[in-house]
């Protein structure tokens, strides 16, 4: 099973590599074509797309969990297919409701929240309404993708994500070079959602066709709606806590200033998204093995070590070389205010990568209610941290608030998983100790050291993580049956 998860993870990483490369090339072109202010609006539009987990009311994730667990228990594929297509129809219907809501709210967002006026306001309003029109298509696509993940078709997903990533960034770049109007650029981004839907529905019809005369079980539909209902709470609060900072900053500062925060944030998430993408292969595997604690233990032990040996060197290198990387990629004037923001966010991104593991474990066991309740607990804490941080430290304070919130989230998720999963307690405790050690090393290298000593220790740590990764690969070769523990 661990080899299968590793294989799926590698395909996920391959697809994400293409997306990362396209994004790194596209953002400087968009900055040159649109300017910092319009680029800030474009990143806000990307933030709205990030709320797709809210728009689908948790049903795409529910499909992943239901399909994985049902097929793992030997359920009929025809019954599973009937449920899947029923839920995708519901998603498209919900999308129409969200379309109307965003269309109606767009003027308020532009004038009150973003505080835009004149030509910029007109362009942004057009772009937001174009984005609204794409929501039903986007939600149907997320349902199909969630099902394909439940079928563990990660190779197929990655192969098609590669050209779609080129389209997602390439089309807005072409439009920006022809006509630097942010409205049309966002409209081009929205158009790619329609293509996504057509692609994924065709693939799903090929792999899991709906058979005439077979209807979805009411119990299965009720389970999916219950799971998705609680998950929608997390999907409301989770993206809100991820993206609320940029919208709060947009209400206080001009778009050019917000870009000093949003561009480092998007850069950091993309630069470290490869290991996180690999971790997404863990969720359906955990759902499939929920009745076998020993298999879940091996999967989680491997995943915790993978987070450390893959994510830690990535965030460490980017943090140490943050200023020169930003200066070369964008320009020196942009790198100055953006560097401390990027370094703080990287700590949070490492912790967030680690938090994905207990989050996936709890949801794979059907406990989306627990993750939702934890997010409800964190929301007021984050609101206080964000307001206080921005008041005292500006955009750097927003980065600090986000990182502190992520640290709290990780601590609560690991504690909850430890409390709920008795067979996994020892492994989880060892994993938390390893993660705390990794955080301490990051803080020491980035903030306490400088000059040749900082560079030397960074090199040693990266080499150590690389050797550890090779050791893990050796242990998971065919014919090797050693159990990996943190």
Region roles according to the model:
Residues 126-129, 378, 427-483:
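Transmembrane alpha-helical segments of multi-pass transport proteins
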């Amino acid at each position: 099973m661990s080899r299968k998860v590793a294989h799926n993870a590698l395909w996920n990483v391959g697809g994400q590599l293409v997306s990362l490369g396209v994004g790194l090339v596209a953002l400087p072109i968009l900055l040159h074509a649109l300017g910092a202010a319009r680029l800030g609006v474009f990143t806000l539009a990307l933030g709205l797309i990030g709320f797709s987990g809210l728009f689908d009311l948790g049903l795409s994730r529910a499909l992943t969990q239901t399909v994985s667990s049902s097929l793992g228990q030997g359920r009929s594929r025809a019954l599973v297919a009937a449920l899947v297509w029923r839920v995708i129809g519901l998603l498209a219907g919900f999308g129409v409701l969200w379309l109307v809501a965003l269309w109606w709210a767009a003027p308020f967002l532009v004038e009150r929240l973003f505080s835009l006026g004149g030509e910029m306001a007109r362009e942004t309003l057009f772009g937001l309404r174009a984005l609204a029109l794409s929501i039903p298509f986007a939600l149907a696509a997320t349902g199909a993708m969630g099902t394909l993940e439940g079928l563990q078709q990660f190779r197929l997903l990655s192969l098609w994500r590669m050209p779609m990533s080129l389209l997602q960034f390439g089309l807005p770049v072409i439009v920006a070079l022809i006509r630097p109007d942010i409205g049309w650029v966002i409209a081009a981004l929205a158009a790619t959602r329609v293509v996504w839907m057509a692609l994924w529905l065709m693939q799903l019809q090929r792999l899991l066709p709906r058979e005439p005369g077979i209807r979805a079980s009411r119990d299965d539909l009720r389970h999916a709606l219950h799971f998705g209902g609680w998950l929608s709470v997390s999907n409301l609060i989770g993206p809100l806590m991820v993206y609320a900072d940029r919208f709060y900053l947009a209400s206080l500062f001009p778009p050019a200033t917000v870009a000093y925060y949003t561009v480092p944030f998007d850069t950091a998430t993309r630069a470290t998204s490869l290991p996180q993408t690999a971790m997404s292969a863990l969720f359906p595997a955990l759902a499939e093995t929920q009745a076998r604690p020993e298999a879940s233990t091996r999967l989680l032990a491997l995943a915790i070590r993978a987070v450390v040996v893959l994510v830690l060197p990535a965030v460490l290198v980017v943090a140490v070389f943050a200023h020169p990387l930003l200066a070369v990629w964008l320009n020196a004037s942009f790198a100055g205010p953006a560097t401390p923001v990027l370094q703080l966010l990287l700590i949070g991104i490492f912790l967030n990568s680690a938090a994905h593991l207990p989050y996936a474990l709890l949801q794979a066991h059907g406990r989306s209610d627990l993750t939702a309740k934890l997010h409800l607990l964190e929301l007021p804490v984050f609101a206080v941290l964000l307001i206080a941080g921005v008041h005292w430290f500006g955009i750097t304070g927003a980065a600090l608030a986000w990182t502190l919130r992520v640290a709290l989230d990780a601590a609560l998720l690991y504690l909850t998983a430890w409390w709920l999963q008795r067979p996994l307690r020892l492994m989880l405790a060892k994993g938390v100790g390893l993660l705390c050690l990794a955080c301490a090393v990051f803080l020491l290298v980035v903030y306490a050291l400088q000059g040749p000593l900082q560079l030397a220790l960074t090199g040693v740590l990266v080499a150590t993580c690389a050797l550890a990764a090779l050791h893990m690969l050796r242990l998971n070769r065919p014919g090797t049956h050693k159990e990996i523990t943190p």
